[in-house]
A protein has these predicted regions:
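Short, acidic, Ser/Thr-enriched surface-loop or helix-capping motifs
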Residues: 45, 121, 137-138
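Sensory input modules used in signal transduction
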Residues: 131-133
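Per-ARNT-Sim (PAS) sensory domains and their PAS-associated C-terminal
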Residues: 2-10, 91-129, 143
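PAS-family sensory domains
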Residues: 4-19, 28-32, 37-107, 135, 140-152
Length: 152
């Protein structure tokens, strides 16, 4: 049985005389929501730098402290992605371009896929997560992506 939860939030109304673009920035708004989220999620800018990550997302992706990742490229070495072969090799550059957070930015569409994340130590198990990403827009242009994760 499917379960859907919805919530309502207040609509931001720009102050009189203030251009809507300045007051309402999607990345900034989403960064507040992501940093406070109980769900594992990450928000990245179009240049792939991490804008916000939830505590659960940081733990699930073996990223260390949430604040340490802010401003760092998502794939700077902290996030070690593996292929699904028996050899568990690290993903190559063309494969990395197809992971959901980056694919949502380049395609401007929803992206979904499984990711295998290398454990933090040799004995730690790898994590397999389902990633669902959506592009974040501003003035019709993609400025980042928001990704939610679920451990498989």
């Amino acid at each position: 049985v499917a379960h859907v939860e919805l919530s309502l939030s207040e609509v931001r109304v720009p102050a009189v005389g203030t251009p809507a673009e300045q007051e309402y920035d999607n990345l900034t708004s989403w960064s507040v929501a992501v940093s406070r989220a109980a769900e594992p999620c990450v928000l990245i800018a179009a240049d792939t730098r991490v804008v916000a990550v939830s505590a659960a997302g940081s733990q699930l992706l073996f990223l260390g402290g949430c604040r340490d990742m802010i401003g760092q490229p998502l794939l700077d070495g902290s996030l070690r992605l593996l292929d699904f072969t028996a050899n568990r090799g690290e993903l190559t550059e063309p494969e990395l371009d197809k992971i959901p957070p980056l694919l949502a930015i380049t395609s401007g569409r929803l992206a979904r896929g499984l990711l295998r994340i290398k454990g933090v130590s040799a004995r730690a198990p790898d994590a397999t997560v389902d990633a669902i990403s959506t592009p974040v827009h501003r003035a019709g242009a993609v400025v980042g992506s928001l990704t939610f994760f679920s451990e498989v």
